[in-house]
């Protein structure tokens, strides 16, 4: 319930401060100032505040301080936030899934990389050397080196956290779309947002050609691809705002 969520958050004053800072930031763009958690839950909704708590907690818990052989943890989280915001936008504009859930799934989609970095460092180094030496994506390098990939590891981790099966599958299958996923729409959004973000950060903005998107995603989100150069610059501004909030404290 709203009261239980508010009471739980209010036991952690650091979290209270972060949530209030977030809801009053440009990321949400609210007109009036929100001064307490109960008001925030009423205005933005139970799921939005719950997912904000999840997002803040995970970034705080998994913000490894060191970088490794050119793997920049700050850039990792910037990419994750960018996919989260892009996923949220696609959900809002298409209406095919909860924008809040898409944000969280987008934020967590690459969590398996952090698990590898923190707990299997030698293996991570081997994969990363393959990425840099052969100009491969992380996923391609994993497939050439080991029998498992970061998406499956992320799926396993989020299942252990008892997150909803649809979210778990969106993380697990975002590189390898399958009809067996619990929620096809959520999976298609995360899969697509990841490709958009990766493409937009590597290609000239006036020569954006998306490749590797699953045909089912093209069917579900087709009209959005035709106008990406019109709407993605606005999403970039929202990404910048989200990164400023979620990362500026955690990366220090």
Listing of model-derived features with the role each one plays in the protein:
Residues 215-252:
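Terminal helices and disordered tails flanking the catalytic cores of nucleotide-processing hydrolases
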Residues 1-132, 136-211, 251:
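Conserved alpha-helical "signature site"
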């Amino acid at each position: 319930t709203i009261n239980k969520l508010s009471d739980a958050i209010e036991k952690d004053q650091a979290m209270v401060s972060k949530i209030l800072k977030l809801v009053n930031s440009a990321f949400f763009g609210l007109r009036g100032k929100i001064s307490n958690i109960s008001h925030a839950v009423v205005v933005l909704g139970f799921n939005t505040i719950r997912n904000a708590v999840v997002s803040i907690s995970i970034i705080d818990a998994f913000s490894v301080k060191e970088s490794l052989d050119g793997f920049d943890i700050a850039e990792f989280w910037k990419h994750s936030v960018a996919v989260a915001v892009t996923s949220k936008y696609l959900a809002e504009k298409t209406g095919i899934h909860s924008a809040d859930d898409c944000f969280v799934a987008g934020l967590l989609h690459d969590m398996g990389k952090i698990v590898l970095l923190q707990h299997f460092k030698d293996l991570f180094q081997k994969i990363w050397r393959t990425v840099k030496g052969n100009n491969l994506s992380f996923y391609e390098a994993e497939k050439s080196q080991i029998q498992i990939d970061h998406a499956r590891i992320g799926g396993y981790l989020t299942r252990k956290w008892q997150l909803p099966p649809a979210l778990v599958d969106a993380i697990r299958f975002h590189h390898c779309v399958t009809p067996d996923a619990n929620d096809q729409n959520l999976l298609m959004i995360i899969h697509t947002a990841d490709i958009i973000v990766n493409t937009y950060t590597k290609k000239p903005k006036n020569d954006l050609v998306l490749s590797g998107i699953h045909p089912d995603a093209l069917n579900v989100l087709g009209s959005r691809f035709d106008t990406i150069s019109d709407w993605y610059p606005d999403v970039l501004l929202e990404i910048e705002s989200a990164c400023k909030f979620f990362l500026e404290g955690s990366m220090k």
